[in-house]
Amino acid sequence: MASDGTDVVALYGGANGLSHKSGSFSVKVGLAQMLRGGVIMDVVTPEQARIAEEAGACAVMALERVPADIRAQGGVARMSDPGLIRDIKRSVTIPVMAKARIGHLVEAQILEAIGVDYVDESEVLTLADDAHHINKNNFRVPFVCGCRDLGEALRRIREGAAMIRTKGEAGTGNVVEAVRHVRSVMGDIRALRSMDDDEVFSYAKRIAAPYDLVMQTKQLGRLPVVQFAAGGVATPADAALMMQLGCDGVFVGSGIFKSGDPALRARAIVQAVTHYSDPKILAEVSSGLGEAMVGINLSDPKIHVERFAARSD
């Protein structure tokens, strides 16, 4: 999916049942596509937002707590204070995203009302509804949603998601789950491309995904919307890896502002995403960054880690 920027993502034009109050789905997908090839950084203060913008971030995610702190502190994680989000919006000129709990349509309505540029319906926050996601077609603002496999990605797109990201395991500094999820999506798409029409119909039922979206994915050879990597990206090498695996861009959360030199690391990760296929540049930007966030070894049986990615499907 990563490219030289000359190709575009075909827009899904299926019957989404858009209401009169919602924005055109193709417009929302186009807005998300404008972020291709970029880095979206989690920030908790206007000062951090300015650091991210100066480093070259294409957007920021306004939060009260980065995922590492959500893990450490526990409790119920909710939408950030609208006042904080407004302060961050005033401090930068790049787009500002904010997270709503899965299924919490009122949090999403509030975020749209205060003018965020994108809403992330996020498993990193505590679930509000363990059976339903937000009907994103009823909103003008573009939505971002996470996935672990192709079926989950296409279900979110049918609900109106204009951008898909891997779920990974946010706040761990460990990229293994993000790699697993993007490889799962890419592997499913490769298998799909070799199927005939009858097999595609059966496959769509098996993965509980809309047939028209499955067929469009087969024809495109990729998701019908942009796909970013998220969850555990902590180094320039991690970011470049996700781009080489085929992602359109990268979310970086705790990995920047839990490191020794956030401004330097932020610039390095932006450069790594831009030059993801050039090992010499990657070696240069990876040098002298100071200490990375300590991170969590997800395979250590002695450590219990709540799996945010498993909170919904």
Swiss-Prot record:
<protein>
    <recommendedName>
        <fullName>Probable pyridoxal 5'-phosphate synthase subunit PDX1.2</fullName>
        <ecNumber>4.3.3.6</ecNumber>
    </recommendedName>
</protein>
<feature type="binding site">
    <location>
        <position position="183"/>
    </location>
    <ligand>
        <name>D-glyceraldehyde 3-phosphate</name>
    </ligand>
</feature>
<dbReference type="InterPro" id="IPR011060">
    <property type="entry name" value="RibuloseP-bd_barrel"/>
</dbReference>
<dbReference type="InterPro" id="IPR001852">
    <property type="entry name" value="PdxS/SNZ"/>
</dbReference>
<dbReference type="InterPro" id="IPR013785">
    <property type="entry name" value="Aldolase_TIM"/>
</dbReference>
<keyword id="KW-0456">Lyase</keyword>
<keyword id="KW-0663">Pyridoxal phosphate</keyword>
<dbReference type="Pfam" id="PF01680">
    <property type="entry name" value="SOR_SNZ"/>
</dbReference>
<dbReference type="GO" id="GO:0008615">
    <property type="term" value="P:pyridoxine biosynthetic process"/>
</dbReference>
<comment type="function">
    <text>Catalyzes the formation of pyridoxal 5'-phosphate from ribose 5-phosphate (RBP), glyceraldehyde 3-phosphate (G3P) and ammonia. The ammonia is provided by PDX2. Can also use ribulose 5-phosphate and dihydroxyacetone phosphate as substrates, resulting from enzyme-catalyzed isomerization of RBP and G3P, respectively. Also plays an indirect role in resistance to singlet oxygen-generating photosensitizers.</text>
</comment>
<feature type="binding site">
    <location>
        <position position="171"/>
    </location>
    <ligand>
        <name>D-ribose 5-phosphate</name>
    </ligand>
</feature>
<comment type="pathway">
    <text>Cofactor biosynthesis; pyridoxal 5'-phosphate biosynthesis.</text>
</comment>
<dbReference type="GO" id="GO:0016843">
    <property type="term" value="F:amine-lyase activity"/>
</dbReference>
<feature type="binding site">
    <location>
        <begin position="253"/>
        <end position="254"/>
    </location>
    <ligand>
        <name>D-ribose 5-phosphate</name>
    </ligand>
</feature>
<dbReference type="GO" id="GO:0042823">
    <property type="term" value="P:pyridoxal phosphate biosynthetic process"/>
</dbReference>
<dbReference type="GO" id="GO:0006520">
    <property type="term" value="P:amino acid metabolic process"/>
</dbReference>
<feature type="binding site">
    <location>
        <position position="42"/>
    </location>
    <ligand>
        <name>D-ribose 5-phosphate</name>
    </ligand>
</feature>
<dbReference type="InterPro" id="IPR033755">
    <property type="entry name" value="PdxS/SNZ_N"/>
</dbReference>
<dbReference type="GO" id="GO:0036381">
    <property type="term" value="F:pyridoxal 5'-phosphate synthase (glutamine hydrolysing) activity"/>
</dbReference>
<feature type="binding site">
    <location>
        <position position="232"/>
    </location>
    <ligand>
        <name>D-ribose 5-phosphate</name>
    </ligand>
</feature>
<feature type="active site" description="Schiff-base intermediate with D-ribose 5-phosphate">
    <location>
        <position position="99"/>
    </location>
</feature>
<comment type="similarity">
    <text>Belongs to the PdxS/SNZ family.</text>
</comment>
<keyword id="KW-0704">Schiff base</keyword>
